[in-house]
Amino acid sequence: MKQLFLIIGAPGSGKTTDAELIAKNNSETIAHFSTGDLLRAESAKKTERGLLIEKFTSQGELVPLEIVVETILSAIKSSGKGIILIDGYPRSVEQMQALDKELNAQNEVILKSVIEVEVSENTAKERVLGRSRGADDNEKVFHNRMRVFLDPLGEIQNFYKNKKVYKAIDGERSIEEIVGEMQEYILSFGN
């Protein structure tokens, strides 16, 4: 059975970098998928779905639920690794519920933990506006992305706390410290 770890955090929290490094350090057993990267890759293909994704992401809005869930489940099931890290999901209560429903309806994947990389809004803003990855990284869009992240956060945290799978990690430290703590935590579940 595959072990799933969801890594959430504000734009600029470092969640993608953290997950990439953990997967790289444990390449035999851990696969990492960034929801953002999966959606950007689809968008770059300029397919009908890709253009639809681009329409939403260029405005800092959420991509429709069915496209996101389909993309994530496809990535999990096609992976040959036993531990799967997915960052940037869930970003809404609806995404959380849709994934929970799908996970409950099968026995190939078990959700082990939801890890939130916590950073202040100022840190997130400095990191995002400093990296300028694309057209979606300007200040107005940052504030929209921050709102989209914060609006459902309390409900998402409570849902996973009630399931006893929520863990918060301080994202204001060095990458080495964050990755070290997160990796140790993930590996503590065994195989």
UniProtKB/Swiss-Prot annotation:
Report residue spans for region: NMP: 34-63
EC numbers for this chain: 2.7.4.3
Say yes or no: keyword ATP-binding present. Answer: yes
Q: Name one GO cellular component term.
A: cytoplasm
Chief subcellular location: cytoplasm
CDD domains named in the record = ADK (cd01428)
Catalytic activity reported? AMP + ATP = 2 ADP
Sorted alphabetically, which InterPro entries does this protein's record hold? Adenylat/UMP-CMP_kin, Adenylat_kinase_CS, P-loop_NTPase
Q: Which UniProt keywords apply?
A: ATP-binding, Cytoplasm, Kinase, Nucleotide biosynthesis, Nucleotide-binding, Transferase
Sum up the protein's function in the record's words: Catalyzes the reversible transfer of the terminal phosphate group between ATP and AMP. Plays an important role in cellular energy homeostasis and in adenine nucleotide metabolism.
Q: What is this protein called?
A: Adenylate kinase
Which gene produces this protein? adk
